[in-house]
Amino acid sequence: MLMRSVCFILLAVLLFSLSACEPSHQQQKQASAAKDEKKDIIPLSAEKADGAEGWLNNSTILYTASNPTKTELFAYRIFTGKAKKLYQTDGQIVDVQINAREQMILLQITHSQKTAVVLLNAEGETLYEKDYETYELEAAWNQYDPYQMMVTEFNENWDFHTYQVNAKKDESFLSPVQVPFIHWTSKNTFDYVKEGRDDKTGPLYTFDTASKTEQKLEDNVLFFDSFHQMSFTVKSASGGKGTYQFKTPQSTSPVTAKWPLQAKYTSLAPMEYDYDEAGGLFYTFKQSGDAYKLAAINVASGETKDLVSLREMEPIQISPNGKYALYGFHFEQIILLKSHETKQLIIDQKEME
């Protein structure tokens, strides 16, 4: 009986200790998040950087720097100010895509009337490289399998040929689907809009590279894009707005939101946008008087929230943890999405002195 009482007392003490530790652990997480928000961002000199290219991880961005003889790609830690050169070329880096999840980088480099597609790991080691003699080039990179891509060559008349590339096997062959712009939706599938009668909307199709089958999904699609585990379509609506339909693996039916469109070239298109997979939030803009409001749409519920007012609508890119947004045509600013503060990432040398 005494032994049973002692065991009961020890068990009660143990449970109390565990319950006491839980709030402390939660407080530590909250304190860590608050500390993360208060970290100072150490800016880059505009004399050193042409512009930022995107997030490699939550605290590291990539940027390019060039002179008449070379272009270099650097990884830059925004909270420590430390930079590391990853890659150098005699040509010009014209496009940088980053797969933060797989820690891989895809470059397009122009040199001597050729465009090279170069695949790197996060240390800057070359995994694949191929030259194309082309007037213009489009590379659709598979975010699910970063060794797969669809490369489209354009000539001066904008005629094109599209090739499916397996970088791991160093294979390239003519794609059975000859469309210039595709969007990967899984390791083996991609979706695309075929031109419609008015050249502004068209039917949306999906193609399975494993089974070599094509399937029509829906009609009258104005715009389509995809991210990892999320895709969306836009259809025209009245009053300069579009009907957005968001799809995720968790959704049983598309989540719909009406949102303003912008006039782009000869058609309507979405405002600048990006997607935060961690938070399930689609970030975009809407005009508000002479300014623009950055807003977030929850792709699971369709709920929207205005975040911050900005003078211009410019490209944005959300960090993998959803805490920060690169903003600007050269990603020269960072928006802290919790406090809505805007910090300068790239500044003139005079401002640094």
Swiss-Prot record:
Signal peptide residues on this chain, from the entry's feature table: 1-20
Topological category with respect to the lipid bilayer: Lipid-anchor
Native source organism of the sequence: Bacillus subtilis (strain 168)
Regions that span the bilayer: none
Keywords: Cell membrane, Lipoprotein, Membrane, Palmitate, Signal
Main localisation: membrane
Lipidation (S-diacylglycerol cysteine): C21
Protein name: Uncharacterized lipoprotein YqgU
Lipid linkage positions (N-palmitoyl cysteine): C21
InterPro entries: YqgU_beta-prop
Subcellular location: Cell membrane
